């Protein structure tokens, strides 16, 4: 949740102080996410009028490309080199602009715009490549307005109570007291630690949920499914009925969705976003996933691999960015009336995990996030679990940026996710081996 959560001060503070620190950080996030830009975008979404969607999208695209030309050296040079003349006259002309690869985003300092963009997003992604991007406050608030508008359409409004299942280290790994959650008061958000999930601890989570009685659940669907399985197997009753469930980050299987709907007696509405700032895709009441065209353009690429152009990435502009996820786009329309392109399937978001000797799960998102402490000096990582108490992190270093102490720093970050019972080894390799399908599996459990 916040960089300082791993600090010794936080880890050794009494629980009420940890809640206070979480809320303090929550206040910082609240001020970043909610403000004049958020209010403006949400009002615009609420009063949407019927317009020519292609013409509106071309206007948005040209505004964004003009910004890139004025404020971003990388794109200014790119447009000049490839004779890109603005404004574009048709949306199809976007294809004249070369594809932006992850390696360029990671290594080229010219990709950062010459404007104030104080909010940093970092990702390990589904490919294990570590990246840092920057957002303006306006970008951040516009994205938040779209996410809140999506939830609003399903009955959940800002200020209602949330239960969020997170793989961030909000509780010390070796905590003995069975309170694996912390409260973010400014956002009325109870944060539940996925890191501490275990068949022994799930009853504690259920008791907390029944006491807190949230209006909605969000975050890791894997964790919510574990709770649902426990409730079904033990015939335990909930004392609340959420308005909706909003899973994030992972691909939700049909059986997982059915189980959540059955046990929590609430509809499940999926969403797609990314730490890099990809255009938003959300699910409507008819079960279809729609692109929010105000946030960008998604182009189908080879083998379903998409290219994204995101209008909410002024700090680190993404134009025809190969994000590494796969989607199937559809020409169908939807009874809900949403003008955004229908996305019939999304692939590439499956989350794997390492299982600890104590029976906990450490998810791939947490493992890849460890490289974010380094200055883009690691190109890629892969975690191999050889035994229940032994993992090996393979990493590919950037020869120009990597320094000797970076391995020590990285190992320390990985160690924070486990108890001393886990033996951890780091190994520098020239490349990570791809699977037969051409993709890299970030986590491989070899002992099962």
Indicate where each model-derived feature is located.
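Nucleotide 5′-phosphate-binding alpha/beta core
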Residues: 1-122, 129-144, 148-161, 168, ...
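AMP-binding/adenylate-forming
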Residues: 141, 163-223
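Conserved beta-strand elements of the Class I
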Residues: 161-163, 307
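Short, hinge-like loop/turn segments at secondary-structure boundaries
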Residues: 180-181, 234-237, 285-290
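General small-molecule cofactor/ligand-binding pocket signal
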Residues: 190-193, 269-271, 424-429
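Adenylate-forming
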Residues: 195-197, 201, 214-255, 270-276
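AMP-binding/adenylate-forming catalytic core of the ANL superfamily
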Residues: 217, 319-420
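Conserved AMP-binding/adenylate-forming
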Residues: 243, 247, 252-334, 350-352
């Amino acid at each position: 949740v916040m960089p300082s959560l791993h600090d010794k001060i936080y880890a050794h503070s009494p629980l009420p102080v940890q809640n206070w620190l979480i809320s303090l950080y929550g206040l910082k996030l609240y001020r970043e996410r909610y403000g004049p830009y958020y209010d403006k975008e949400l009002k615009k979404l609420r009063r949407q009028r019927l317009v020519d969607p292609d013409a509106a999208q071309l206007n948005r695209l040209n505004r964004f490309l003009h910004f890139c030309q004025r404020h971003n050296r990388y794109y200014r040079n790119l447009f000049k080199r490839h004779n890109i003349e603005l404004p574009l006259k048709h949306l199809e002309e976007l294809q004249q602009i070369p594809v932006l690869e992850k390696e360029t985003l990671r290594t080229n300092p010219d990709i950062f715009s010459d404007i104030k963009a104080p909010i940093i997003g970092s990702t390990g992604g589904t490919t294990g490549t570590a990246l840092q991007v920057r957002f303006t406050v306006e970008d951040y608030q516009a994205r938040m307005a779209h996410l809140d508008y999506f939830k609003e359409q399903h009955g959940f409004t800002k200020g209602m109570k949330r239960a969020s299942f997170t793989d961030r280290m909000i509780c010390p790994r070796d905590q003995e007291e069975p309170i694996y959650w912390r409260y973010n008061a400014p956002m009325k958000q109870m944060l539940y630690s996925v890191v501490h999930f275990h068949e022994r601890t799930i009853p504690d989570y259920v008791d907390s949920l029944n006491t807190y009685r949230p209006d909605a659940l969000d975050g890791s669907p894997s964790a919510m499914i574990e709770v649902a399985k426990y409730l079904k197997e033990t015939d335990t009753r909930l004392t609340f009925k959420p308005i909706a469930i909003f899973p994030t980050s992972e691909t939700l299987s049909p059986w997982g969705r059915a189980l959540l709907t059955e046990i929590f007696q609430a509809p499940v509405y999926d969403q797609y976003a990314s730490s890099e700032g990809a255009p938003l895709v959300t699910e409507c009441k008819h079960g279809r996933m729609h692109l929010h065209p105000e946030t960008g353009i998604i182009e189908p690429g080879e083998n379903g691999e998409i290219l994204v152009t995101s209008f909410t990435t002024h700090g680190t502009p993404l134009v025809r960015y190969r994000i590494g996820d796969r989607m199937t786009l559809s020409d169908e329309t939807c009874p809900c009336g949403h003008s955004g392109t229908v996305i019939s399937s999304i692939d590439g978001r499956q989350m794997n995990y390492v299982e600890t000797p104590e029976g906990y799960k450490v998810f791939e998102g947490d493992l890849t996030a460890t490289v974010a402490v380094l200055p883009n000096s690691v190109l890629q990582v892969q975690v191999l679990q050889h035994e229940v108490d032994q993992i090996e992190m393979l990493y590919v270093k950037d020869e120009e940026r990597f320094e000797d102490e970076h391995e020590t720093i990285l190992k320390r970050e990985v160690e924070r996710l486990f108890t001393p019972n886990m033996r951890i080894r780091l190994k520098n390799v020239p490349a990570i081996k791809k699977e037969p399908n051409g993709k890299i599996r970030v986590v491989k459990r070899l002992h099962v």
